[in-house]
Amino acid sequence: MTKRAVLAGGCFWGMQDLIRKLPGVIETRVGYTGGDVPNATYRNHGTHAEGIEIIFDPERISYRRILELFFQIHDPTTKDRQGNDIGTSYRSAIYYVDDEQKRIAQETIADVEASGLWPGKVVTEVEPVRDFWEAEPEHQNYLERYPNGYTCHFPRPNWVLPRRSAAE
């Protein structure tokens, strides 16, 4: 059985490129979520964030592990911004599908806060998942097709998120 995760953390190209490579991630697609416009598109996505939908095998990878990479590859302390990308489209958000994901998201954020790995306070939103509008084909797997394309996401070397008991 598979599970679904929906995240937003800046431009969806870089998020998808790194998350899709995790063992246990079966499928990813980029799109628009967390906002107010039905049938969102790149040119008209209102208050939606650029997001990624992840289908994963929980026997091979945990939701927590996906969130650990999420917090490693984007800056969760900058509101409505990732690198040079500025605006609500680029906010940090976790859209949970059930109470278990909500709990894990809140615990992981608390671990990030306690770890000191990021210099500021985490501003990642935690909200229930709503509609996910798939982005246009040219945005899907963008960096797989254009390996030298734009991204502001990268794994930080030696970045390991401890649980609070180990971080304190």
UniProtKB/Swiss-Prot annotation:
Catalytic residues of the enzyme: C11
Q: What's its top-level EC category?
A: oxidoreductase
Catalytic activity annotated for this protein?
L-methionyl-[protein] + [thioredoxin]-disulfide + H2O = L-methionyl-(S)-S-oxide-[protein] + [thioredoxin]-dithiol; [thioredoxin]-disulfide + L-methionine + H2O = L-methionine (S)-S-oxide + [thioredoxin]-dithiol
Gene3D superfamilies from the UniProt entry: Peptide methionine sulphoxide reductase MsrA
Keyword line: Oxidoreductase, Plasmid
User: Can you cite a GO biological process for this protein?
Assistant: protein modification process
Instruction: Quote the EC number.
Output: 1.8.4.11
Pfam families associated with the record:
PMSR
Q: Which InterPro entries match?
A: Met_Sox_Rdtase_MsrA_dom, Met_Sox_Rdtase_MsrA_sf
One GO MF term attached to the UniProt entry? L-methionine:thioredoxin-disulfide S-oxidoreductase activity
Q: Which domain of life is it from?
A: Bacteria
Q: Which family does it belong to?
A: Belongs to the MsrA Met sulfoxide reductase family.
Sum up the protein's function in the record's words.
Answer: Has an important function as a repair enzyme for proteins that have been inactivated by oxidation. Catalyzes the reversible oxidation-reduction of methionine sulfoxide in proteins to methionine.
Task: Write the protein's name.
Answer: Peptide methionine sulfoxide reductase MsrA 3
Species, as recorded: Rhizobium meliloti (strain 1021)
